[in-house]
Amino acid sequence: MCGIVGYIGAQEATPIILDGLKRLEYRGYDSAGICTLLEGKADKRRSEGKLINLERLIQSTPLAGRIGIGHTRWATHGPPSERNAHPHQAGSIIVVHNGIIENYLELKQRLVTSGRVFNSDTDTEVIAHLIDDKFAGTGDFERAVREALAEVRGAYALCILCEREPGVLIAAKQGSPMVVGLGEGEFFVASDIPAILSHTREMVFMEDGEIVVFRDGHPTFSTVAGAPLDKKSRHIDWSPLMAEKGGYKHFMLKEIFEQPRAVQDTITGRLLEEQGDVRLEEMKLADEQLRGIGRICIVACGTSWHSALVGKFLMEEHCRIPVEVDIASEFRYRNPVIDSKTLLLVISQSGETADTLAALREAKARGAMTAAICNVVDSSIAREAHGVLYTHAGPEIGVASTKAFVTQLVALYLFTIRLGRAVGTIDCEQGRTMIGGLLKVPALLEQALETNEQVERIARRYMNARDFLYLGRGMNYPIALEGALKLKEISYIHAEGYPAGEMKHGPIALIDENMPVVVLVPKNSTYEKVLSNMEEVIARGGRVIAICSAGDEAIAKKAEVTLEVPTDGEELAPIILSVPLQLLAYHVAVLKGTDVDQPRNLAKSVTVE
């Protein structure tokens, strides 16, 4: 999500760090900064916007020093600004950080009570103050870091400097990537390989709960608790472009495989397990306002519209509030009925989708409450809505959305719990059950990703088909729509998603031995109905690709091809079922030789109406 680069050695640190940050630009960012140490004094340069702004700042006021840390920030706590940009300093401690600290508010309140003053809105500054607080008591930099991290909950990749120990660089990892590069008398730290690949190909990959201390010309690895580790380096032969993609052939495949982490980042710090509730402070909707909602309109475009359709099922089922779902480009031209008891919820990955932004403005003008689900912090939609729920998917480079879609589904699930608790339709026990289900999702996604090789074989079998039909019922109908959209977006094969029960009202006329039909048939309340629809396809010679719950032998006996995934409960199944559909579209497109990451005629963010 963010980029980190650290250096300690005989060369000037700033050019190396700046070059590394440039090589991480593909990850997306909204601000950047560098800090070096020279003669025990920290010197920082930070700027909002692109790296060119930071570069110009450094050209006008150079940074000297042979030890330093740098960062590109994708905002999660606090809007993009110079004061929220990293590095952050508290006393003699300077920190750059990727990740999300779950208990930062609790730690911050304690530190403020003890007299500490904060200068930013970030969770990262809390880490700097906490380490400095420990350092004030121990006078030992390394010990202070270990003691501070013992109190931190959440995900982090950290690079830390101390003015009082200017020859030491410390890095730590928990839940966010961190790699160490080994050079000749010099060492590099980065959040991703591309940042340092031009300097060394000898890498040590840190694991969760590990810390590395660079002192006296060599690194010492250990656990945060202090147990020594014998880490082995690996030689990396990747090209720079391969490194940006994490070794994957395309950004889209990389982003498909990032989904477990993206979901974890989206729920981290938001779940109140004991209370059976969730914390969504950035939505700025108090319980009293939520109880005043008479109707919800969800407005979106493309993939986001498909997630909105799933949200309708969730909210009506659990919150008993009527929900309408509109395509943004249609919404503003039909004179919709909107009043002060209407909540307009818009969904946009980029936060800049022109039609969705126009719908938001229309609803605000009519007096509706407004909220947004966005991935990009401080985007136009995020700024103009009354409140926002950010999906922490990180930058999505591939035009065809994958991890942004899945995190939108998770965000809608979170909002459903919050709304249901506020209006009293979800009690504490039910909230705990729903949260328990959410906590399983990252692991279930990991299992679904294990079908990748099987999906590739299926893609090879059906890649020359001219048309595909995707069928689903209930909450899985929008997933059928999304699967069809993915295939047509990147493989240029015509595909349609349809409610399985509507097949006999038209599409059944198209079915023959040349048409693959992808049927979503997990074990749920409509299982028997979908099974019947599948039989109708088979009776007409259709070639059924069935995606079903793990262990469903009945489906395996009927379908031409079966893909089993771990669908844990009816309401979480849409999230898991998305994975094999994404993989199918991806592998068909690769086999057909299309431009997977930048398909023809499409743009990542549609900023024109």
From Swiss-Prot:
Alphabetical GO biological process terms: carbohydrate metabolic process; fructose 6-phosphate metabolic process; protein N-linked glycosylation; UDP-N-acetylglucosamine metabolic process
Compartments where located: Cytoplasm
Domain of life (superkingdom): Bacteria
Signal peptide: none
Glutamine amidotransferase type-2 domain: residues covered: 2-217
Family matches, as Pfam families: GATase_6, SIS
Enzyme Commission identifier(s): 2.6.1.16
Active site: C2 (nucleophile), K604 (for fru-6p isomerization activity)
Domain SIS: 286-425, 458-599
GO molecular function terms listed in the Swiss-Prot or TrEMBL record: carbohydrate derivative binding; glutamine-fructose-6-phosphate transaminase (isomerizing) activity
Enzyme's top EC category: transferase
Keywords: Aminotransferase, Cytoplasm, Glutamine amidotransferase, Repeat, Transferase
InterPro entries hit by this protein: GATase_2_dom, GFAT, GFAT_N, GlmS/AgaS_SIS, GlmS/FrlB_SIS, Ntn_hydrolases_N, SIS_dom, SIS_dom_sf
Primary subcellular site in the record, as a coarse category: cytoplasm
Transmembrane segments: none
Gene Ontology CC: cytosol
Catalysis: reaction(s): D-fructose 6-phosphate + L-glutamine = D-glucosamine 6-phosphate + L-glutamate
Subunit structure: Homodimer.
Function: Catalyzes the first step in hexosamine metabolism, converting fructose-6P into glucosamine-6P using glutamine as a nitrogen source.
Name of the protein: Glutamine--fructose-6-phosphate aminotransferase [isomerizing]
Record organism: Geobacter sulfurreducens (strain ATCC 51573 / DSM 12127 / PCA)
